[in-house]
Amino acid sequence: MGFNVIRLLRGSAVAVVLAPTVLLTMLSSAERGCPKGCRCEGKMVYCESQKLQEIPSSISAGCLGLSLRYNSLQKLKYNQFKGLNQLTWLYLDHNHISNIDENAFNGIRRLKELILSSNRISYFLNNTFRPVTNLRNLDLSYNQLHSLGSEQFRGLRKLLSLHLRSNSLRTIPVRIFQDCRNLELLDLGYNRIRSLARNVFAGMIRLKELHLEHNQFSKLNLALFPRLVSLQNLYMQWNKISVIGQTMSWTWSSLQRLDLSGNEIEAFSGPSVFQCVPNLQRLNLDSNKLTFIGQEILDSWISLNDISLAGNIWECSRNICSLVNWLKSFKGLRENTILCASPKELQGVNVIDAVKNYSICGKSTTTERFDLARALPKPTFKPKLPRPKHESKPPLPPTVGASEPSPETDVDTEHISFHKIIAGSVALFLSVLVILLVMYVSWKRYPASMKQLQQRSLMRRHRKKKRQSLKQMTPGTQEFYVDYKPTNTETSEMLLNGTGPCTYSKSGSRECEIPLSMNVSTFLAYDQPTISYCGVHHELLSHKTFETNAQEDTMESHLETELDLSTITSAGRIGDHKPQLA
């Protein structure tokens, strides 16, 4: 009994001694779990955007996820992650890493996701990824890789996705992916690859998606992919492919999408190019150099439900008819921007509308271009040129080699004339606009000058109207003569009193009476016949410039003086004739 009590006391003493030690260990572990400046969420540690140049050493050993992205790490040392044997994902993207030790990833066998994108890595040693055989996702994109080792991915049998996008790779070693039997996605886009060896993809029996876009391929041979029996999506857009062919004798039944947009494809090597892909559902051929597609190629597109053909140089002739008929019967998704690139008359017109409106497929090829030219709208304005006069010649007999003028030439001429008319109209409009602008600026800057110009313009208009009214009152210049047939009473009255009525007439005009004041001396001195009429001499002065109203009054007084002189002369001569009559 006493022995048991002593034993119990000893056990209690040991527990009391060990309790502080365990507590200190727990506290130190808690302090080590979340480094300074980092954010910890359970067993996930986020040390992002801290400008770190070294990986913190105080990370908990039980950490499951570590993010060190957007820092300034430059290299990964030997056993860099030793002690983090529970780590399952590691993000090291967007750093300055350029050197990775061959044993940097030792001790993290449970790692499933490794992100090393957007760094400065130019090469990897062959054994770099040997310690992380459980990787599912490996991202090496946006680096400076020039080449890959032949055993670069040796042992990565569980890898599902591999990203090598946006590097500087030129070649891919043969059988480099042989151990990646479970790989489903391979991204080799945005590199400088020109060609691929036949056995590059050997062993990749589960690959479903392959990216080869934005490389430098010039040919596409579907026989290069004989072992990709599970491939569903193949992306080869924006290369330099001009020829597509296939030399394989088996059917590629798994392929469902093929993207060949943005290449230089002009034609297909044979009618059986697409016969090896009977389950193809989506085909992208936009932005190439296709002018037409043959009927045999169209017949092989039996399974398509989505097609893209925009951005090609379609020639809207009879060769386009098979494609238009196929598009009309196609029930899947397609773009409506399939436009004609030639001939010039149809540039920018939808191919279906062109065939419908211009009857391209309804008539023979010999009259096709002629009918097309006649069907096109002609410009409304057509300049009429004067016809040169030629001497009449007998018609020449028709020759064998003579041909009628081409209607296409007439259409071109009318097209050019229409453009000239438009250009002239635009030039005239711009000229008027410039004149109005100058007038507006002058009016704003020199308002007094503009007022003076307006006043002068009004005065000129007033004078012009006055002269026109005088011209209307005054008939044209005619020959005037004095016709005087006095009676006996009038003659005696004029001789006795010195005054009498005098009548002159103007041919085709009117008559007026002029009172005369006989002055014999004036009559004797005036030896030329003077013809006076009612205001006619105003026309003789109409060419003179009347500056002011005072000048106009002066001219009117002169006219009255001349009228008096003419009247006296006529009266004197009438008196001279009287004795003769007597």
Swiss-Prot record:
* BP GO annotations: positive regulation of amyloid-beta formation; positive regulation of synapse assembly; regulation of presynapse assembly
Q: Which residues form a coiled coil?
A: none
Q: Where is this region: Disordered?
A: 378-411
User: LRR repeat positions in this chain?
Assistant: 61-83, 84-107, 109-131, 132-155, 156-179, 181-203, 205-227, 229-251, 252-276, 277-300
Annotated glycosylation sites: 126, 357
Main location group: membrane
For membrane topology, the record states: Single-pass type I membrane protein
Looking at the keywords, is Transmembrane present? yes
What are the residue boundaries of the LRRCT domain, all occurrences included? 312-363
Q: Where in the cell is it found?
A: Cell membrane; Postsynaptic cell membrane
Q: What are the protein's UniProt keywords?
A: Cell membrane, Glycoprotein, Leucine-rich repeat, Membrane, Postsynaptic cell membrane, Repeat, Signal, Synapse, Transmembrane, Transmembrane helix
* Chain ranges on the Extracellular side, renumbered to this chain: 31-420
Cytoplasmic domain ranges by topology: 442-582
Q: Where is the signal peptide?
A: 1-30
Q: Which residues cross the membrane?
A: 421-441
Q: What GO cellular component is one of the record's annotations? A: extracellular space
The chain positions of domain LRRNT read: 33-58
Q: Which PROSITE patterns match?
A: LRR (PS51450)
Source domain of life is Eukaryota
Q: What does this protein do?
A: May play a role in the development and maintenance of the nervous system. Exhibits a limited synaptogenic activity in vitro, restricted to excitatory presynaptic differentiation.
UniProt record similarity statement: Belongs to the LRRTM family.
Q: What protein is this chain from? A: Leucine-rich repeat transmembrane neuronal protein 3
Q: Which organism is it from?
A: Rattus norvegicus (Rat)
Q: Which gene encodes it?
A: Lrrtm3
